Regions:
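Charged DNA-binding/catalytic regions of mobile-element recombinases
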Residues: 1-294
Length: 294
């Protein structure tokens, strides 16, 4: 800009100089007509004090060390510390965590999964499709706890779960389905309209007793293609989240301890776990929002 001003002062045309040097003509005119005693009184906005925010972030990170900056931000915004939500921008949370080395370690790019699934498991309304799957948790003493759960494919709430140190059989899956139906519609009730019950091809799900009982409850059994676990991707994703954010961080000395902790873990997931697909709201808060809109 100084070069452009010098050329114009020597008599060069303003339009020609601005075009050749690529500067703004309006800016050039403003500088040429500015008074000699002009003082730039513009000031940068005051930088917010990050000490309290950093303290709140550390408090969240201590309890939930697997949460990235987005979920930390969601906890602060929607739940807050001691129940007091904090209005803060997610970019500011990222900056504070970055400057204080609190961001999670970024893993390298994962190899592309060749087991592609082009279908869509998620649905727009609750009680349209439920998915179910099971997983295993190993204890320090060698015992294993096997867990099965029922998850709504819209609001992501875990409606029911069962656990055992033995295998998941048709009887336990029947209990799982009945608990889910009674949780959503009341004791002794059945689904008002058929609800898809999505599962894999495990023997406990394909058993005649399971399919018959599901239909009695108003559920419509739907199974994934053989050797296609990605077709039940929502349940698979939940298992990954549950193990990463809860099971791996906890002491698991024996099966009795794990059985006691499972209830707390599922409750925390439903009440407080921010979900990206739900606008970073926990499942139950998302359901409350749904009901208020409808």
């Amino acid at each position: 800009m100084d070069c452009a001003l010098a050329l114009v002062a020597r008599g060069r045309p303003v339009r020609e100089v601005c075009f050749v040097l690529g500067v703004s003509r309006s800016h050039m005119t403003a500088l040429r007509t500015r008074k000699a005693d002009w003082v730039d009184r513009r000031k940068a906005p005051p930088r917010p004090d990050d000490d309290q925010l950093l303290s709140d972030i550390i408090t969240v990170a201590k309890d939930l060390p697997t949460y990235g900056y987005r979920r930390v931000w969601a906890i602060l915004k929607f739940q807050g510390i001691d129940g007091s939500p904090r209005m803060v921008n997610h970019k500011r949370v990222y900056r504070v965590m970055r400057d204080n080395n609190l961001l999670l370690f970024r893993h390298g790019s994962k190899p592309r999964d060749t087991r592609r699934h082009d279908g869509k498991v998620a649905v727009q309304t609750s009680n349209t499709r439920w998915c179910s799957d099971g997983f295993e948790l190993a204890c320090d003493n060698g015992e294993k706890v096997r867990v099965a759960f029922a998850l709504d494919c819209c609001d992501r709430e875990v409606m029911s779960w069962v656990a055992t140190t033995k295998g998941i059989d048709a009887g336990l899956v029947g209990d799982l389905m009945m608990q889910a139906v009674e949780y959503r519609f009341g004791a002794g009730s059945t689904a008002q309209t058929p609800i898809e019950w999505l599962s894999d091809n495990g023997s406990c799900y394909t058993a005649i007793e399971t399919r018959t009982f599901a239909k009695q409850l108003g559920l419509k059994p739907v199974r994934t293609p053989v050797e296609s676990p990605q077709s039940n991707g929502m349940a698979e994703s939940f298992v990954k989240t549950f193990k990463r954010d809860y099971a791996r961080l906890a002491n698991r000395p024996d099966s009795q301890t794990v059985m006691r902790e499972l209830k707390l873990w599922f409750e925390h997931y439903n009440e407080k776990h921010p979900h990206s697909a739900l606008g970073y709201l926990p499942p139950r808060r998302f359901r409350e929002k749904q009901r208020s809109i409808n």
